[in-house]
């Protein structure tokens, strides 16, 4: 298939995904009239429908593109991301979902005020919610820019603007009621879009003799040319078949060969030509040989791999319990029992999905290894079907993947924007429907420049940092607020400030470029890139210690509050907390 025909087919698939999102959102939001409709879909969403919607919004750019990219680049240690993303719902199922729904709250800040009776705590929680959602929106917009650039050759800024516009239109039109339909539909679209190519490539792999765990990096199957967009350091295991034009180790070369294995710095604009069968250079910090890639313990680039893995587990498992756009969906269930059933169903849906990006990451290393040269492995899922299969079938699979990628950005962005709008409209503005819509517009626009600034950060790493902030703030607030009677507003505020401040600073530094990897044996760079293993325990400890010191300020009716959260609804203790309806 010609490149023009492929571009047209891909553009059609992207347009289909975007248009179907708008139409499904309009259908879902056609009856949205009240504040309850916009914030919690009138608490009338059943477990199966809600589970599909939660899975649809949770499977973000990091899940659809980033997991496969990390597996292709780093191998076995990258599997902790999908494991943690899924296992986090076990924590939600056991500790949070039912008590949170029984509280009657409609946002996380509202739960904070319900539990501890502090408007100051509510304000701090609102700020934390907005920060987490903005940090999480950044990789969604970032992934949209990458997708349109790779598939259609469009400027990077068009992706964030297009996704932002569509999401704002959906959220403004019907709030939670609208995006519930959108997200449930998009889960099945994403599952189809990633499962069909993965199974097709699995059939190709089973008939292939390619080796994953060999002593060399993967080799290209045909002559391949790679252009370096930014300066990069690569590790060359076997220089045979590689010629370079441009800048190597700050020296200008023209159609030169590399003299020996080793590390080389390639300057911007440098072109590498790999003959068919040549071993691919690999970006420094990633596993070089097949044996290194298939073995665990190497981490995800940089120093201190064991700490990296531990921090990833903490961030993904506990961060899920602190994601505002996930938590708010449990407010839409009719009762606590339905919330628990929803969380259980989500675990099954996510487990089914994450099998396929893992497979695609393995196949990407075999069939598009040239991505390992620049380290831009997030593009692997987008390029893999056409590169490995080719022809009409490959083009069709590539278009299907493109539709799924756009669905991933739109679904997650919709949930995040509802959380931002709900927090701002009820805690900063007057809680009217028009305030919700205004907050949605502002919340959708602000992350666009941040996404453009963070374009060099891998998608799963970007999302992992947002998880670290959530795990360091709202997770301790919810776990201690639901299960420990001794929590006070002073302790909660102190923990939010300590956990949020430290993880927020680390995330900001990581987005703008971090620090030198060689400083102090690599610890500053590692702590900035993976802060959760430090910031989460500090947040819990701060809340407990300060609460002990301020025990006299604990709410006097804590027994009644706990009864409301933990006693089944059929005993009649529940009270719904919703702002007054107004246009």
Mark where each language-model region is.
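Membrane-embedded helix-loop-helix hairpins and adjacent transmembrane boundary segments
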Residues: 1-583
């Amino acid at each position: 298939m010609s490149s023009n025909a492929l571009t047209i087919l891909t553009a059609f698939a992207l347009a289909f995904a975007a248009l179907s999102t708008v139409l499904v959102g309009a259908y879902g939001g056609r009856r949205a009239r009240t504040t309850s409709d916009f914030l919690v879909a009138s608490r009338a969403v059943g477990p199966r429908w809600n589970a599909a919607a939660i899975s649809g919004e949770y499977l973000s750019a990091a899940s659809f593109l980033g997991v496969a990219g990390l597996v292709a680049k780093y191998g076995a240690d990258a599997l902790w991301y999908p494991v943690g993303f899924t296992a986090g719902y076990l924590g939600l199922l056991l500790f949070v979902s039912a008590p949170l729904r029984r509280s009657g709250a409609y946002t996380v800040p509202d739960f904070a005020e319900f539990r501890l009776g502090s408007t100051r705590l509510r304000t701090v929680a609102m700020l934390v919610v907005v920060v987490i959602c903005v940090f999480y929106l950044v990789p969604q917009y970032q992934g949209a820019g990458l997708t349109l650039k790779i598939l259609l050759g469009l400027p990077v800024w068009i992706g964030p603007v297009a996704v932002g516009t569509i999401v704002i239109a959906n959220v403004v039109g019907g709030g939670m009621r609208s995006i519930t339909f959108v997200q449930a539909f998009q889960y099945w679209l994403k599952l189809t879009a990633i499962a069909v190519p993965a199974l097709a490539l699995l059939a190709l792999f089973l008939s292939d003799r390619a080796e994953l765990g060999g002593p060399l990096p993967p080799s290209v199957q045909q002559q391949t040319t790679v252009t370096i967009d930014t300066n990069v350091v690569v590790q060359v295991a076997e220089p045979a078949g590689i010629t370079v034009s441009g800048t190597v180790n700050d020296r200008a070369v023209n159609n030169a060969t590399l003299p020996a294995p080793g590390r080389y710095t390639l300057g911007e604009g440098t072109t590498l030509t790999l003959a068919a069968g040549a071993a691919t250079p690999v970006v420094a910090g990633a596993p070089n040989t097949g044996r290194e890639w298939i073995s665990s313990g190497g981490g995800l680039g940089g120093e201190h791999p064991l700490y990296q893995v531990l921090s990833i587990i903490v961030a993904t498992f506990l961060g899920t319990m602190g994601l505002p756009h996930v938590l708010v969906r449990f407010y839409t269930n009719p009762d606590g029992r339905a919330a628990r059933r929803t969380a259980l169903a989500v675990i099954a849906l996510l487990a089914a999905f994450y099998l396929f990006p893992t497979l695609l990451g393995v196949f990407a290393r075999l069939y598009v290894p040239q991505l390992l040269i620049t380290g831009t492995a997030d593009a692997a899922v987008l390029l893999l079907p056409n590169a490995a299969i080719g022809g009409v079938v490959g083009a069709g699979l590539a278009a299907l993947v493109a539709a799924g990628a756009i669905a991933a950005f739109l679904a997650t962005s919709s949930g995040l924007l509802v959380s931002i709008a709900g927090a701002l409209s009820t805690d900063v503005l007057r809680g009217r429907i028009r305030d919700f819509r205004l907050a949605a517009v502002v919340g959708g626009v602000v992350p666009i420049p941040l996404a453009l600034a963070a374009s060099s950060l891998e998608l799963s790493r970007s999302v992992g940092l947002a998880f670290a902030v959530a795990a360091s703030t709202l997770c301790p607030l919810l776990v201690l607020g639901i299960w420990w009677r001794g929590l006070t507003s002073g302790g909660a505020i102190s923990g939010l400030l300590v956990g949020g401040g430290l993880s927020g600073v680390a995330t900001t530094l990581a987005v703008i470029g971090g620090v030198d990897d060689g400083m102090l044996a690599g610890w500053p760079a590692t702590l900035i890139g993976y802060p959760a293993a430090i910031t989460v325990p500090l947040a819990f400890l701060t809340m407990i210690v300060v609460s002990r010191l301020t025990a006299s300020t604990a709410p006097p009716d804590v027994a009644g509050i706990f009864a409301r959260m933990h006693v089944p609804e059929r005993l009649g203790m529940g009270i719904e907390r919703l702002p007054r309806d107004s246009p």
